[in-house]
Amino acid sequence: MILRKLLSGILGLAGILGVNAFEYAPFNVSASIALKVPGNMAVHYPLILNKLSNGNFDYQLVSDHKLPVLLYQNVTGEGQTKQISLWMVALEDVYFNFGEQVKSDARHDDCLFYMPGFWYRRNLRSPKEAPSFHTSDSWLVREDRLSTPMTTIFDEKNKKSISVTRIAEFEDEALTTHKEGEVILSGKTSIGYTGFENVSGTATLSFGYPYKEAPKTYIRKLTLAPSVEAYQFLKKGETLTLTWEIHETAAEDFSDCVKQAWEYSYDLYKPTPVETSYTDEIMKDVLSNFFVESYVDDTPTKYYSGVELRTATCENLDVAEVGFVGRTLLNAFNALEYGEGKQRADLVKNANSIFDSYLQHGFSEAGFFNEVVHYKRNFVEKNHSIRRQSEGVYAVLYYLNYEKQHGRKHPEWEKRLKTMLDAFLKLQNPDGSFPRKFKDDFSLVDKSGGSTPSATLPLVMGYKYFKDKRYLEAAKRSVGYLEKELISKADYFSSTLDANCEDKEASLYASTAAYYLALATKGQERAHYAGLAKKAAYFALSWYYTWDVPFAKGQMLGDIGLKTRGWGNVSVENNHIDVFIFDFADVLHWLSKEFNEPRFTAFSEVISSSMRQLLPHEGHLCGIAKKGFYPEVVQHTNWDYGKNGKGYYNDIFAPGWVVASLWELLSPGRVENFLK
């Protein structure tokens, strides 16, 4: 441990010495202000930074034209970190949009870019209908799209990064009548913009206030709209102060860049747990109502209806889904364990009925789960996914282990799972990956390896339960693939099934998979897998909010007091927040102890506390029709999945996986106990 700390200190010093201190000066900084008279197109004025030799400010920002505002700027700090503070006073009533550009000393083509929870590398895994280099090599976005209001430029060639981060209280938001073009805000907003631009071949940080988005604004799933530029009103005589922080550091690669950026943003924002009265016991008591009211028993396989529900009614539907957004089998195990502990015979009876019915009617001819069934439409999904199949096996292994501990045996279930795990061995590619989707005859539908880590978990558990080393070796090969193709390349993508892009779940699953193997191995192997888990964990963490997004009056999420810190952005394609966590909190606690990194445990507590806020119950239904049906698509920025926009949910949701995720968060230590 002493040697590790010494090496860490040496590397940190090398990072400091390896970067020339950024110089903020007129030769690499430009600024402009746009002024709008209602009913007229805005006029944009370039600004000149005039150095002041005395007084309270370092620079005055002036134009060739007489402006109805005075602009002054201070630059404080030394070395790698500098704060830029802009002071503005209105000489007349004005509507304005201010912007600034800071050039790096790197070629744009040599750089990768990072906007936490939204932009990784060049977003080339994302479709052209979402923000990516497919559309443009320069992007400006609203700050509330990002888990930290930061943009980082990583110079791959010279192994260094430069970032800009907004520093503010973020207390206000205002509604607008339009979502594109020049828009005048209905009140005060705290939200500015941040991003990167290619300025004559040089990678450039761009930032300003209030928000604007260019070259497009991302308003809905797979929908890019024309750019938007907001205008804030400043009354004559009023002043405004805006602050940003510029930070430079050395970084070995993009993974190191993201790691350092997350540590820096965590230390800068210092997120604290959200105060809530919802204890673990209260949470489970309320959530257990989902097991009661969603239960469907008039179909061959009994299930919890947790997919494609309407938030306005939460009426049960005909869709039974094993994993992914349904998570019927994991919820059945949770209900069984909880029901027996609380002497709730109804929960126990229904959970056992689900497992019994799936054993009899839940499999395809080849022995895979019928992972999605639409009963009224008489439709069974013929394309299997390694993710849903894996999540089903995972849940049943927990069930079998629990039953065995209570003296109950299920040889038919064990036979079924052995058949499935053996099929996994057949599906696995020579490089260790698993195809994302396949058919009953093992022919491939989607050969992408993005969902591979989902298979690692049941393979490790299957090794422990069945004492079959083949499953452990397959798990090791799968993480070997993750190490080579995802972790070492910092390229986490397409783990989820409803989007093809950079996403949170890919890095979260990769970190969790390596963690499972670390628990199942010893010595150098264990240390190696622990290191991989940590490396991937920084990418997963980067999707979770370190700050509280402001909402406007009339936006429900703001009116009920939602604090966004600790919630996770989903993906580039799906720009909303949710409570996807499962046992990643356990991973963070374990890594915190393993590497003496207190940030992991501290932020895990932020996540755990924050994700309790929207618990729907009598008098606090949070826009959901039924108690315990926790919301899924929580829309916190100018984007929606299809309906309702910022401050609300999409009208359709899948509480099945949400309840399962929160339940695992509230049940710490599960896998460590399983693998003992």
Predicted regions and their residues:
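Active-site lining segments of carbohydrate-active enzymes
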Residues: 376-380, 398-469, 484, 534, ...
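Beta-strand/loop-rich accessory regions of lumenal/periplasmic or secreted enzymes
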Residues: 40, 53-68, 72-236
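Short Pro-Gly-centered flexible turn/kink motifs
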Residues: 231-255
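Glycine- and aromatic-rich loop/turn segments at beta-sheet edges
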Residues: 287-320, 360-381, 424-444, 484-501, ...
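Low-complexity, Ser/Thr/Pro/Gly-enriched N-terminal "stalk/linker" regions
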Residues: 22-46, 51, 234, 252-321, ...
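Aromatic-lined, polymer-binding surfaces characteristic
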Residues: 385-389, 445-456, 486-489, 495-511
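Extended, well-ordered alpha-helical scaffold segments
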Residues: 257-293, 342-361, 405-425, 467-484, ...
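Well-ordered alpha-helical scaffold segments within catalytic/enzyme domains
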Residues: 329-345, 391-409, 454-468, 509-525, ...
